[in-house]
């Protein structure tokens, strides 16, 4: 009977550990999902910046063309063209930087997705393990109840003798 109690207590301890691990995995999953959400927001922001920079670059390139055609004075034309060329260079550099950040963020999002999937599988595994342990605990409790009832009957029969 003591062994049965020890087994039940051990099963309860295992169940408690499984529940704790499942809760920890769920917390980690929530954290990873939050990180994923933040990375998605960052990705969207960088995408908008990249699109804006591309649009601005196209506008400046068009403006550069128009200024070159309209300018009568070579000195003025040269100065304005240099300024616009410099702006174009800066925008191209900014576009390259944004593209790099976009690629990095995309890779980080992919890695975060992989982590989230891993933790989801781990949570499911721990939940199945917990369910199995709970079922075993119920079975052992039923066995304990039956054995105790039989023991009480035997004890009662012995007392009646």
From Swiss-Prot:
Entry-linked SUPFAM superfamilies: Tropomyosin
Gene Ontology BP term (one): plasma membrane fusion involved in cytogamy
Predominant location category: cytoplasm
Keywords, sorted A to Z: Coiled coil, Cytoplasm, Cytoskeleton, Repeat
Biased composition, class Basic and acidic residues, residue ranges: 40-52
Top-level taxon: Eukaryota
UniProt-annotated stretches for the region Disordered: 40-65, 107-134
Record's subcellular location: Cytoplasm, Cytoskeleton
Molecular function in Gene Ontology: actin filament binding; actin lateral binding
Coiled coil (UniProt feature): 1-161
GO CC annotations on file: actin cortical patch; actin filament; actomyosin contractile ring; cell division site; cytoplasm; formin-nucleated actin cable; mating projection actin fusion focus; mating projection tip
Annotated domain remarks: The molecule is in a coiled coil structure that is formed by 2 polypeptide chains. The sequence exhibits a prominent seven-residues periodicity.
Function per UniProt: Forms part of the F-actin contractile ring during cytokinesis.
Known partners and oligomeric status: Homodimer.
The protein's name in its UniProt record: Tropomyosin
Organism: Schizosaccharomyces pombe (strain 972 / ATCC 24843)
Gene designation per UniProt: cdc8
